[in-house]
Amino acid sequence: MTKAVINSYVLFSKLEQGREGHLQTLQEQLGKISFVEAVFPKYEKVPFIKQLVAQSKKRTGKALLESEIGCLLGHRKIWHLIANKIDCENEHFLILESDSKIIALDTLVNAFAQTVSINNNSKYDLFFWGAWNGNTRIKKSTQIKWSNKYSIGEPLIKSVYGTYGYSITPKAAKLLLKQTAKINYPVDYFKYHLSNTNLHIGAIRPAVIDTWKTTASNIVYENKGLLIKRWLIMQIFDFRNMIIAYFC
């Protein structure tokens, strides 16, 4: 097995059950890995959580779940760590979650070195290695072929959801901290967090990072009916995004 040498952060809590094997696999795959404690309001006291829920509804018309706020706070902890790395402003740091699954390690290693980490001087500030269950769409005008099977370019921002496999620079971390300083949308609603910013965003398709899907979500309750409904909705939106991306 190829072992990556990528500075990586994994959001994880000892309160999560059934994901220890996932973490062991990530440790075997990645050379530099740091664990950051996840935030779970249902298990721990989060100051002003009720007020934060109320404020999110006031700002957007829809209240965030406490678990969604916890997820956002967890990623903000990682962004703070990266934002403080002032000596490596252009270096990329990989961010994963406890159920992240690297499905193409060699591709991740090579693409990371050749695309986002060229002498620590990447043209991208934020790069998605997997998002929205592999349904990220890349704008055709920016798309370049990479290693036969893959395409790299600027993603259609409305096709990017999920925080289980992305990398950012300290510059991007600082901007995300600023954009999410007021609790309003879930952490993976990038179409809101990244609007009117000058960040250079990239993505790869097919995805090289996915999720294991062997344990239940820690954010929202999902039964079989909801999963089927979500899958159908995703197919409809993916078809729409495919057409939009073709003309972008």
Predicted stretch roles:
Residues T2-L96, S100-C248:
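An acidic/histidine-cluster motif and surrounding catalytic segment
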